[in-house]
A protein has these predicted regions:
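Electropositive, gly/pro-rich neighborhoods at or near active sites that engage anionic ligands
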Residues: 101-295, 407
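C-terminal functional extensions of proteins
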Residues: 341-408
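Glycine-rich adenosine-cofactor-binding loop
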Residues: 2-21, 31, 278-282
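Short, charged, surface-exposed secondary-structure boundary motifs
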Residues: 38-44, 94-100, 290, 310-317, ...
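Short, polar loop motifs at secondary-structure junctions
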Residues: 32-38, 67-69, 207, 283-286, ...
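NAD(P)-binding Rossmann-fold cofactor-contacting core
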Residues: 24-42
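Phosphate-bearing ligand-interacting subdomains
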Residues: 36-112
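A mid-sequence, solvent-exposed acidic-amphipathic segment
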Residues: 285-328
C-alpha cells in the first residue's frame, strides 16, 4: 500500500524531493504553496493547494521542500497538523526517522544535505578575508552605521533611497518575488546608485566586511549573496568617491543578534516625522502604521495606494500622483525598488522623501518579540510564509486617508 504525501513548496528544491522519493511506495496527493497565485494550478501535473486546506485532506506526511523550513513547521502546527506528520526534507536529523525509510532513497537525501553544507563552508572560506578585521588592504565600500544614518535623516532632513539585495538582483537582470526585471528599471537603479546630491543620500547593505552582528542564518545568506552576485560586479556599480549610508535602518530588529538597540532606531524614525504632515506611498494591503503607534505623532496622514507587485510598470502614474500633492509634506515610501527610484526623483523635484521599506513590519516584529520573520495579520508581508495577505477589512480611518489609488 502506497503512502499518501503532500509536498510543501513548488520551487527548485521540490524537484530534489521528487528525485529522492521512491515513487513505487508513495503517492503525491498535492503540492502546497503560500503563493496564492499558484493555488488551483498544476505543478508537475499535480494540484497546488492553499496550506490552510491541508487540515481537511487525507495524507500521512507533509514533506517540506524548503531549506529554511522552521517557519513552515510553525505554520503547519498552527493549522493543527500533527508534528509527527511534518517532515522537513533539509533537516539533517531526518535520517534518524526510521518510519521514512520506505519513502526515500537515502543516498540522495544525504547527498543533497551534504552538498548544501559543503557549499556553505566553501562560501564562508571565500568571504573570510573580507570579514577579518585584521586585514585592512582589501577594498570595501564606505558604509556609515545605522546611528550616523539616522542622525543624517533627523538633523538635516535629506531624502534617502535604499538598496537591498533585491535591487542588486534587478540590476543584474534577475527578477524578484514581487517585481519583474526590466532594462529600464536596471538603468534607473544604477543611476540612483552612482548619483551625487546635496539633498539626497543612498543607503546600501552593510555586508562587505564583518558579518558577526547579524544572525547566523543571515550571515550564511549574505555570504552566498556576495558569491552569487559577486563583489566585483557590485563594486563596479558603486561610486568609489561617494559615501554610502546604511540601508539596514529600516531593518533594525529581526536581522541582528543583539536586538536591544532596535527601539532606539524606531524612536529616531518617529523624530523624522514628528508633528509633520505625511504622505505615505505604499502597496495595496501594506497598511503602514495601522494597528500600531508608529505614526501617532504626525500632524496628518494621507496615502497613495499602488500595486503590491510590479509597481514599476506604473511608475509614471505613481510619480504624477505624488507631484499633485503639497511639497511641504514628508513623503514616506514603502514600494520596493520603485521607492528607491521614486525617492531620488522626488528629491530632485524639491520633495522630502524617505524610503522606509520594511520599517512597519520590523516594528510589528519588535513589538511582539518575534525571533524570525512571521506573517503579520492584515498586512502584506512578502518575506514571511503565509504573509501574502489578501483579506478585506473595514478600516474607515485608513480609507479616509487614501487620496488616490494608482494602477489598481
Amino acid at each position: 500500500m502506497k503512502t499518501d504525501i503532500i509536498i510543501f513548496g513548488t520551487g527548485k528544491s521540490s524537484e530534489l524531493v521528487l528525485d529522492a522519493l521512491k515513487m513505487d511506495n508513495v503517492t503525491v496527493n498535492a503540492f502546497a504553496d503560500n503563493n496564492f497565485n499558484k493555488h488551483g494550478t498544476l505543478y508537475k501535473g499535480i494540484n497546488v493547494v492553499n496550506p490552510v486546506d491541508l487540515i481537511k485532506m487525507e495524507f500521512s506526511f507533509v514533506i517540506i521542500a524548503i531549506i529554511k523550513y522552521h517557519s513552515v513547521v510553525k505554520q503547519l502546527l498552527g493549522y493543527g497538523i500533527k508534528e509527527e506528520k511534518i517532515v522537513p526534507y533539509f533537516d539533517i536529523d531526518i535520517i534518524d526517522n526510521n518510519k521514512l525509510t520506505d519513502m526515500f532513497f537515502w543516498e540522495r537525501m544525504l547527498r543533497d544535505n551534504y552538498n548544501i553544507k559543503i557549499k556553505k563552508i566553501e562560501i564562508k572560506l571565500e568571504n573570510l578575508p573580507y570579514e577579518s578585521v585584521s586585514i585592512r588592504e582589501l577594498y570595501t565600500p564606505e558604509v556609515k552605521g545605522i546611528t550616523e544614518t539616522m542622525d543624517m535623516l533627523v538633523d538635516t532632513g535629506v531624502s534617502i533611497s535604499r538598496f537591498g539585495d533585491g535591487e542588486m538582483k534587478l540590476i543584474a537582470g534577475k527578477g524578484i518575488g514581487f517585481q519583474k526585471a526590466s532594462g529600464e528599471l536596471a538603468e534607473r537603479l544604477k543611476e540612483v546608485l552612482k548619483s551625487q546630491s546635496e539633498n539626497h543620500i543612498t543607503g546600501i547593505l552593510d555586508v562587505f566586511g564583518s558579518l558577526t552582528k547579524y544572525t547566523d542564518g543571515l550571515q550564511d545568506y549574505f555570504r552566498e549573496y556576495l558569491h552569487d552576485y559577486n563583489r566585483e560586479f557590485q563594486y563596479g556599480l558603486l561610486n568609489i568617491n561617494k559615501t554610502y549610508y546604511n540601508a539596514f535602518i529600516t531593518r533594525p530588529y529581526i536581522s541582528y543578534k543583539d536586538k536591544q538597540h532596535a527601539g532606539e532606531v524606531f524612536e529616531s524614525f518617529k523624530k523624522v516625522w514628528d508633528g509633520k504632515n505625511i504622505l505615505i506611498v505604499e502597496g495595496d494591503r501594506t497598511r503602514l502604521g495601522r494597528g500600531n503607534d508608529l505614526f501617532n505623532n504626525v500632524k496628518s496622514c494621507k496615502r497613495i495606494i499602488c500595486p503590491n507587485e510590479n509597481a514599476f510598470e506604473k511608475y509614471g502614474q505613481i510619480l504624477g500622483a505624488v507631484k499633485k500633492q503639497d511639497k511641504g509634506m514628508l513623503v514616506l515610501l514603502a514600494l520596493g525598488p520603485t521607492a528607491t527610484i521614486l525617492a531620488y526623483d522626488l528629491a530632485k523635484e524639491g520633495f522630502h522623501a524617505v524610503d522606509i521599506g520594511h520599517i512597519d513590519i520590523e516594528y510589528e516584529w519588535y513589538l511582539m518579540g518575534a525571533t524570525e520573520k512571521i506573517a503579520v495579520k492584515n498586512k502584506y508581508t512578502n518575506e514571511a510564509y503565509g504573509g501574502n495577505s489578501h483579506d478585506s477589512i473595514e478600516d474607515k480611518e485608513y480609507e479616509e486617508q487614501v487620496v488616490e489609488r494608482v494602477g489598481l
